[in-house]
Amino acid sequence: AREERLLVAAVDDKLQPGEYIVTNPKTEQQYKVVYRGANSQWNYCSCFDFRTSQLGTCKHIEALKLTFGGRRKVHRELPSYSSVYIDYRQGRQVRIRIGCDNSEAFKMLANDYFDEHLALKPAAYAHFHEFLAKARELDAGFRCYPDALQYVVERRENTERAAWVDALGQEDFDSLLHTRLYPYQVEGIKFALKAGKSIIADEMGLGKTIQAIATAQMLRRKALVGNVLIVCPTSLKYQWKREIERFTGETVHVIEGDLLARCKQYEGQEPYRIISYNALSNDLKLLKSIEVDMLVIDEVQRLKNWNTHIAKAARKVNALYAVVLSGTPLENRLEELYSVSELVDQFALSPYYKFKDRYIMLDERGATAGYRNLNELGERIKCFLIRRRKRDVNLQMPERQDKLLFVPMTKQQMVQHDEARWHVSVLLKKWQTMHFLSETDRN
């Protein structure tokens, strides 16, 4: 907070006391901060670090502490209205704060939906809309903060989507693509559909690409997805295009051209659009963020260092659904696993300091010496990561087919071939005549 010299401005000391806008002058990013005192449980910031660190503070809240420094009055008083919010100190918990306005009626209402710790009951997520309607009848000033409502909606959608996937039959998958899907591929597609945002880390050769395409097609069939953005290495752009066209018959657009031309192409109507990592990174310097229905990231191991420009760019693509593909075993380096997991669920393994302390062993120099508690970690990631090896699904795979393709040589290759053939013929003749080859000949 001291180093970045953040700018602090009050929203409205009379109408919204204790609420501030904190601006980072370098990035021009603005954050909403609620400050009720140095160690108040009611402090809040809209930044990513506050939501995931579980510390109850961040550099923007610390900037408020520096700004006040005992010289200005801190608005410690809480609003009179009741509100539903997310407590980020132990993961994410939806809670209610009961204000002084009509407090007894709100306490009675809360008993039906919240537990003794004022946390939303698991069974109440499905009926949260009923609670909101009753709460607004009690007090027009009642608030449900956007992040809390979004989380409730997310939980409900996950439940509804899981029920839909469980009801899918084999005929739904048989008609999905212009090819037959193997049982393990259907399993991977169902996994990705249920998760919403997932990592498919199958061994190379098991058809991760086709699983991602089939997942997108099933979501499009359900009208949950309208457009899909595929991010991949430059060398794979047209391979993705051919595969999508071959298996779906849908229109595919490869985003190319100069910076301004590419930025316009994100608004196209094609169901599938493809962009390279480097182009996306450059485009987001101008666009700041991109909104898509579904995101597919191929060769995600290239994003293992989350401080690179490309990795940061991938995190600025906002998508309702995502499938991340990796052909390398992420469990070999837990630091990379943590980085990739942030692309599908920023809260799954965070905060990093707790993750590192729990699962990574360091030597006296601070370097990684080994890992621990891996069974526990496996349980944590199995809701969003699936990995199969060829030996695991060997019985489901077709028999190996070998095809010989004869390709004519180019002129340059023919010249090199003829030179090599001449040298070989000389050596053969010498051997047939003398039955001896010198060391120079043998090399």
Language model features by range: what are they?
Residues R221-N227, R242, R246-G249, G268-Q269, ...:
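Conserved P-loop NTPase motor "coupling/switch" region that bridges the ATPase
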Residues V254-R262, Y277-N282, R302-T308:
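Conserved helicase motor
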Residues E364, K390-N443:
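Inter-lobe connector of SF1/SF2 helicase motors
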